[in-house]
Amino acid sequence: MNFQQLRSVREAVRRGFNLTEVANALFTSQPGVSRQIRELEEELGVVIFERNGKRLTGLTDPGKGVLKIVERLLVEAENLRQASQEYAAQEIGTLRVAVTHTQARYALPEAVQAFREAFPGVRIALQQSAPEHIAEWVLSGRADIGIATEGLSAFPDLVSFPCYRWSHVVVVPEGHPLLAKTPLRIEDLATHALITYDVGYTGRGHIDAAFVEAGLAPDIVLTAMDSDVIKQYVSLGMGVGVVASMAFDHGRDKGLRAIEASHLFAPNVTRLALRRGAYLRSYAYHFIERFAPGVTRAEIERALQPMGEAA
C-alpha cells in the first residue's frame, strides 16, 4: 500500500470517477491510475469501485467505508509533513489564503501587513476566487485558510468562524436624485438600473432577498466580482451601485457618494474556514487571531478535531 494508491482513490471520487481528470490532477497516466486502484483493491481484498467495463461508475458499499479511511490517512499524512516542517523551521514557510476579491482588497491588507511584520520569514500566497472554489481549495489542501462571506459554512468537512459583520451601501454619482431620498427605500432602488456583485459573491443573496421580500424585480444591468469594477461603471453613469460598505472610501472614490443601506439589506458575516482535521503551523494561528480577534487558538484546535473526537 502506498500514498499514490490512496490519492488515486480519493481523486477518482473528487473528479466524478473520470480517470482522465484524475490522471491530470496527479500528473500521471490514465493506465497508471487504473493500476494503482486495482493493486490497492487486490491488496485489501475489497472491490472499492463499481464498474461498467473499464469505466468507474461509483463506490461500492465497502468502498464508501474505505474512502473515509483513505481521506483520514491522507489528512494525517499532510499533518505529519506540516508538523515536521514546524519543528524544522518555526517561523519560515508559506501561508496560503484563499479569499474573495473584496476581502483581499479591502479587509485583509491591515492583517497581512501586521502579520508580515511579525513573521518576515513567512510568505503569504493570496489565492483569489469564488466562494465555492475557496471551499474546494481548503478541502483539498491547496489552501490553508479560506475567507469569504458566502458558502463556507455549508461544508461539513470545513470548520468556519465568524470574523466581522458588515452591510451594503448604495453608490451613486454626485448630484444623483437618490441622494434626496432620506431614508432610501427599496422601492426607490427598483426604479433605477442597478450594478452589483455576481450571484454567490459578497452578500448578493441578501440583496436579492430584499427585493423578493418587497415583491419587486430589480433591474440589474451589470454584475461583477470586483467592487472597483462596479464603482467604475457607476461613475460612467450606467447605473446605481450596491457594494460592500468597506469597499467605499470617501477620499479615494472621487465623484461618487455612498448612501446608507443597512436598513434595506440584511447584515453579512465574513467567515474564515479551515479543513477539519488539518494541522496548522503556529504562524497560521497568529494570522487568524489578527484577522478575527475574537477567535482563540484553543477554540480553533477544538473545532479542528475530526467529527466524533471533540471533547
Predicted regions and their residues:
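A short LG(V/I)-centered, amphipathic sequence patch enriched
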Residues: 41-61
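Alpha-helical linker/hinge and terminal dimerization helices associated
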Residues: 43-44, 66-88, 287
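Secondary-structure junction motif
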Residues: 178-179, 193-214, 280-289, 294-308
